[in-house]
Amino acid sequence: MSALREKLDHLIGQTELEVSEKQRSQLVGYVELLNKWNKAYNLTSVRDPQEMMVKHILDSIIVSTHLQGKRFIDVGTGPGLPGIPLSIMNPDCEFYLLDSLGKRIRFIKQVIHELGIDNVVPIQSRVEEFQPEEKFDAVLSRAFASMTDMVEWCHHLPKEQSGVFLALKGQHPRDEIDLLPEWCSVTDIKALQVPELDGERHLVTLSRQG
């Protein structure tokens, strides 16, 4: 067993997550590809693959149990975070991964090809210019922008009645909440426990008022 797989198994063992053998292999494969491509394309500031397991994989999949719906868009996905790990964890759901930089989308296309992921749609576009044929159950954001910018730029993406915004944040974002537009309200804030991660993590759920 590889050191990366041992690390992943150890981290998952500290959570309530149920992760199959296939999913574990795909998550390790993703980190191996990210580490390989990162040397040439500078996709993440995290250089150590062991550290990627904590800061990128666990920090993403810990959100999995909080997803409701079948159709999601990850805006400002970068190299596919949290979209790729979440797509691996939720093979019955559809994930659109959006980023404006071509090198990131090329990497994501390579990942889904090599790992056999068939529930991801990569999109190269600015978020405010992307017009989906069908709206989404949730708009996901991790290290993308302030929550105000997120909801303003992505207001056209969630389903009118039931769609939500899910913002993955560090410390409790009290200051950002105070600045949200009047049409947007916070419906839930969950403190997330990410094994071996220094610092706090919070998942903020935002929805339209009324």
Swiss-Prot record:
Top-rank lineage group of the source organism: Bacteria
Coiled-coil blocks: none
A GO molecular-function annotation: rRNA (guanine-N7-)-methyltransferase activity
Catalysis: reaction(s): guanosine(527) in 16S rRNA + S-adenosyl-L-methionine = N(7)-methylguanosine(527) in 16S rRNA + S-adenosyl-L-homocysteine
Organism annotation: Vibrio atlanticus (strain LGP32)
Name under which the protein is recorded: Ribosomal RNA small subunit methyltransferase G
Entry-linked Pfam families: GidB (PF02527)
Keyword Transferase on entry: yes
Keyword S-adenosyl-L-methionine annotated: yes
InterPro entries for the chain: rRNA_ssu_MeTfrase_G, SAM-dependent_MTases_sf
Biological role: Specifically methylates the N7 position of guanine in position 527 of 16S rRNA.
Keyword list, A-Z: Cytoplasm, Methyltransferase, rRNA processing, S-adenosyl-L-methionine, Transferase
Gene: rsmG
Residues annotated for S-adenosyl-L-methionine binding in this entry: G76, L81, V127, E128, R142
Top-rank EC class of the record's enzyme: transferase
GO cellular component, one term: cytosol
HAMAP family hit by this protein: 16SrRNA_methyltr_G
Family membership: Belongs to the methyltransferase superfamily. RNA methyltransferase RsmG family.
